[in-house]
């Protein structure tokens, strides 16, 4: 990886006509702006379908794409919808906030209209055949789930819950149209994303995607393959994932995701993981692995506990996992999310893997000094962020942190006062100027937005994953400023360097 930079902007945060960011013309325009700004990467969040809580890290499938991201204008061009039909539904009226309730009640209705006009062809048939290993279970799962009012598979009758063949065959016959509807959604999603991804690559922009380490309990993955997880004889979790208590939370974090049966995964040579990562490498150019330390050891909380207090660290697969993956798939473009407290064994695993870890500027300013997140301490093989989707915006963070931290930050930046209208750019400057090979800046920091633009507050429910960039905010002035800073710190793509020397 050459010295470069990029922007973090979730697909759902793009501006668009229909309530949520999608694979619309605005996505293509954003790619063009990244190219003009001298960027090399567009980092996004997981693309999977979301449910209660709207988190892309709690998806109904590790393979499926979010149908909300299907561009309706493209379906109009294909003759599957009319513009009038698109305007008949209420997708929400706020340009800067996603109204998921309105999206849920409108998007599937309009997609159903498109599905009713859709005619299967050879391309569609090939897609269904090539993706049958996950698409068949996912479409059946969602169709059954809908028929039962949206409840999770563990609440279904035993015959379906335990996947008895007669019950599955009856469901396939009774729900044939609903199953086909979900296959249609995935076909359109994959077609549109593939076109956008190809366009981005053609403009010199690579996509950084995201693999959540865990899957949701309410998912096609757990229902179809319970042997992959730590379940009892009745397919209930024995233990679930989370984080132990720390200075930020006296009771820790109870994520609730099922834990992997690593013994089974090792016995099968991590075959499920290899298929999953291979699929991700079709969607993305670089993959960020969430919660990297979970492969060294994972925090196990007894199922049914209300807090994470009584959990314990258990050994994960370690480098055996990554050696096996590399043996099967070759050298991988992976970024390791290694934030938080790291043991010596995690650091050894990161070093052995050769993957770049993450550095976050907001974490740097412990008034005691010596933080590994201070830019002068970064290794070259790392990816620096001003903040991530789980942090406040830099402007929001600065105003909410304590005086000692603010004073240290100002001293480090070598200023007595930070300009309110420009605050985030001082921290972008620190990230860009660092030795870290790759610098990724969240869009909210490029726009110097406050805490109202925060994407997620971990361990909270409601109000997350809703921020959208308003149309026109990422304007020519900001694009030009980003380009100049990218040039200044020698992060421009090679083909752009020669043509810009005289200008600057």
Where are these regions (language model features)?
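N-terminal regions that are enriched for targeting/export leaders
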Residues: 1-12, 25-28
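Alpha-amylase-like alpha-glycosidases and glucanotransferases acting on alpha-linked glucans and related
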Residues: 10, 16, 54-186, 215-440, ...
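Short alpha-helical segments and helix-capping/turn motifs at coil-helix boundaries
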Residues: 25-32, 126, 191-199, 273-275, ...
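Catalytic domains of carbohydrate-active enzymes, especially glycoside hydrolases
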Residues: 25-50, 283-284
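Surface-exposed amphipathic alpha-helices with a cationic face
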Residues: 35, 193-203, 326, 350-351
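Outer-envelope exported proteins of Gram-negative bacteria
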Residues: 45, 206-208, 212, 286, ...
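Conserved, well-ordered alpha-helix/loop/beta-strand core segments that scaffold catalytic motifs
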Residues: 182, 186-215
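Structured C-terminal cap/extension of enzyme domains
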Residues: 448-500
């Amino acid at each position: 990886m050459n010295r470069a930079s990029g922007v973090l902007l979730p697909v759902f945060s793009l501006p668009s006509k229909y309530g949520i960011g999608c694979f619309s013309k605005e996505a293509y325009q954003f790619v063009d702006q990244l190219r003009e700004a001298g960027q090399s990467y567009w980092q996004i969040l997981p693309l999977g379908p979301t449910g209660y809580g709207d988190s892309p890290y709690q998806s109904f499938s590790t393979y499926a794409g979010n149908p909300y991201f299907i561009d309706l204008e493209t379906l109009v061009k294909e003759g599957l919808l009319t513009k009038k039909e698109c305007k008949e539904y209420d997708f929400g009226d706020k340009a800067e906030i996603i109204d998921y309730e309105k999206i849920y009640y409108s998007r599937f209705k309009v997609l159903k209209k498109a599905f009713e006009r859709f005619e299967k062809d050879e391309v569609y048939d090939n897609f269904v055949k090539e993706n049958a290993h996950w698409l068949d279970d996912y479409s059946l799962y969602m169709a059954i789930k809908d028929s039962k009012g949206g409840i999770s598979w563990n609440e279904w009758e035993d015959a379906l819950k335990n996947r008895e063949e007669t019950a599955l065959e009856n469901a396939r016959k009774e729900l044939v149209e609903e199953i086909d509807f979900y296959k249609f959604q995935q076909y359109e999603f994959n077609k549109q994303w593939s076109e956008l991804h190809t366009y981005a690559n053609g403009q010199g922009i690579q996509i950084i995607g995201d693999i959540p380490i865990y899957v949701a309990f309410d998912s096609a993955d757990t229902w179809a393959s319970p042997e992959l997880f730590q379940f009892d004889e009745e397919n209930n979790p024995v233990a679930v994932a989370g984080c132990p208590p720390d200075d930020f939370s006296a009771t820790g974090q109870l994520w609730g995701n099922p834990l992997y049966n690593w013994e089974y995964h090792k016995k099968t040579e991590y075959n499920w993981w290899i298929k999953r990562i291979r699929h991700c490498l079709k969607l993305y150019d670089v993959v960020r692995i969430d919660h990297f330390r979970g492969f060294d050891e994972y925090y196990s909380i007894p199922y049914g506990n209300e807090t994470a207090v009584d959990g314990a660290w258990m050994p994960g697969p370690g480098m055996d996992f990554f050696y096996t993956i590399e043996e099967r798939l070759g050298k991988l473009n992976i970024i390791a999310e290694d934030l938080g407290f790291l043991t010596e064994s995690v650091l050894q695993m990161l070093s052995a893997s050769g993957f770049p870890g993450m550095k976050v500027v907001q974490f740097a300013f412990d008034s005691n000094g010596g933080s590994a997140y201070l830019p002068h301490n970064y290794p070259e093989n790392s990816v620096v962020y001003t903040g991530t989707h789980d942090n406040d915006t830099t402007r929001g963070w600065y105003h909410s942190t304590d005086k000692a931290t603010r004073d240290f930050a100002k001293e480090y930046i070598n200023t007595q006062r930070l300009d309110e209208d420009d605050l985030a750019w001082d921290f972008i400057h620190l990230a860009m100027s660092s030795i870290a090979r790759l610098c990724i800046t969240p869009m909210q920091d490029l726009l110097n937005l406050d805490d109202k633009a925060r994407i997620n507050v971990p361990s909270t429910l409601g109000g997350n994953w809703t921020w959208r960039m308003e149309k026109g905010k990422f304007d020519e002035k900001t694009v030009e400023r980003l380009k100049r800073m990218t040039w200044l710190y020698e992060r421009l793509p090679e083909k752009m360097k020669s043509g810009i020397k005289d200008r600057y």
